[in-house]
Structure formats: C-alpha cells, structure tokens
Amino acid sequence: DIFKLNEDLYSITINKNDIKDELSHKLPIAGSHLNDTIKKMLTGSITLKKIDIDLDDYSSFVFGALRALEAFIKDILFKKGIQVKNINSFVDVFFEDKRRGTFEMTTECELQINCQKTRNALVECFKYYSNQRHGLFHADSVVSMSRLIESRSEADEIINNVLNIIERSYREIL
C-alpha cells in the first residue's frame, strides 16, 4: 500500500501532444525547420520541466536541451557541407581565442559556410553550448568542485535559453 501511495503521489500525467504543442509555441519559426530527432531531444527537457520534484542536482533536466543544441549546430554545419569529424568535439570547427575571450570559427569553415549571419548564429550557439555543457557533463578532477545545477530555476533558465538561441538562430539564418 505504501508503494501504491507513493506511485499515486508522484504520478503525473503528461500528454506527449501537449509537449509537442508547447515546443511549437516556443519555436514558431525554427520548429517547422528542425530535424525531428532534435525535436525529440528537446521534448525530454520540456517534459522534465513539468515534474514538480525537489532534487539536489537538476543537471539531468538540461541534458536533452544541450544535446539538442549540439545536434542543431551539427545539422546546420552538415547542411553547409561541413561534417564534424570528431564526434566528441568541435575542434575542427570552433576554437577559443583566449586573448580576446571569444569563440571563433575556423577560417576553413567560414569560407565553406560563406554567410556571416549563419557563422554568427553558429558561434553564438557554440559559445552557449560550450559554456554550459562542458562544466555540467564532465566531472572535475576534484569531484567536489564539479558543477551542479542546484536550483530548478537555473535548469529552467538553461532550457529556455537553448530554445531561444535555436529560435533566434533560425530567424537570423532564414
């Protein structure tokens, strides 16, 4: 009976179509152009936003959104004739200019893309992706220094930022 009570207490009804509708609402332009796999990645994070649960770490909530942002970058690059060679890295496409504190695109990729708006959108996407994902999904060598998302509001903000960046990028590129 205790297990049934807990199941009922934490059970939440989330309709897949409602999540898809919310995604369409948040991505009015990009939504109709996004690869279906990227949409599926985003729906996981949107679904987790609906669950009312108190956690010590909400990193899992943002995983789908940041993975979708990575896929979005790779999809745009692929459409421009650039295939990311290293599955775990964008080292052939972007680099950090530590002197200026910015991320830049390699000259070879800029020439291949041949569109300043697309280049700028991709650099913005990569900057956010890099700043968020690397710290969240890789543990620090001093484990206690590893980044956690300790508040629900921070997780929601990251998810919303990813959605906004994707939408803004499509508006710029189209």
Report the location of each language-model feature.
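Charge-rich, solvent-exposed alpha-helical interaction surfaces
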Residues: L5-D8, D18-E22, K26, T37, ...
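Charge-enriched, short contiguous segments at helix-coil
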Residues: C115-L174
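Intrinsic-disorder-associated interaction segments
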Residues: D8-K16, K20, L27, G31, ...
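Generic structural signal for well-ordered, non-membrane alpha-helices
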Residues: K39-T43, R67, A71, N131-H134
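Short, hydrophobic, well-ordered secondary-structure elements
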Residues: I46, L55-I82
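Flexible secondary-structure boundary motifs
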Residues: I76-V123
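Charged alpha-helical initiation segments
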Residues: I2-S60
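Generic surface-pattern signal
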Residues: S24, P28, T47-K50, I82, ...
